[in-house]
Amino acid sequence: MVDNEKSRLPAAQVWIYGLPALALTAVGIPLLLFLVPFYTEEMGLHPEVVGYVLFAVRLLDAVFDPTFGTISDRLRTRWGRRRPWLIIGGAILMVAIWHAFMPPEKVDWVYFLVWMLILYASWTMVIVPYVAWGAELTGNFDERTRIAGIREVFLLVGTVLTAGVPTILKLFGVSGQTATMEAIGIFVLVVLPVSVGLVLWRVPEPPPIASA
């Protein structure tokens, strides 16, 4: 963490840090708006099965957050504590996005369960260290607020863009739940590696504060 509380982080650095939020929120919105009708109406899974799977995964997600947070805090590598999680978790997340958002023509509940588990786990592997990294960039309260605010801007933009995908597709004469999920999936698969790569390249990761 930066010790100088009067220091102001470069604007470019802060905006680059916020970029991954654009893709990360695009993962969450389909789970809330589009996933259930896509898998029930397009893929043919029973609504109760989809509901049970998502309920079970959400229960496990309550374990994922503190688990990955604790491991990330304690991790020590020459690349830092947060970087490895964004790299490994981001790669797994991209594979999960590909399979969950663009599945084969025929799937069963096992396929859905497996890829939902991997999707939620890998998303947590990225988002928890990512948010922690932002808080560690400075010890200044105002700067932390600025960093979080810019991250929220990207979250808001990603939310609006993702929720508006069906409308955007209609402007090009394309419609349907499959097209919507594919468009969002491709968006994440393009934006996530580029934005994470920029963060790894341009945003410093302060060393952890030694405990007394």
For each of these PLM feature ranges, what is it?
Residues V2-A212:
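Membrane-embedded alpha-helical bundles of multi-pass transporters/translocases
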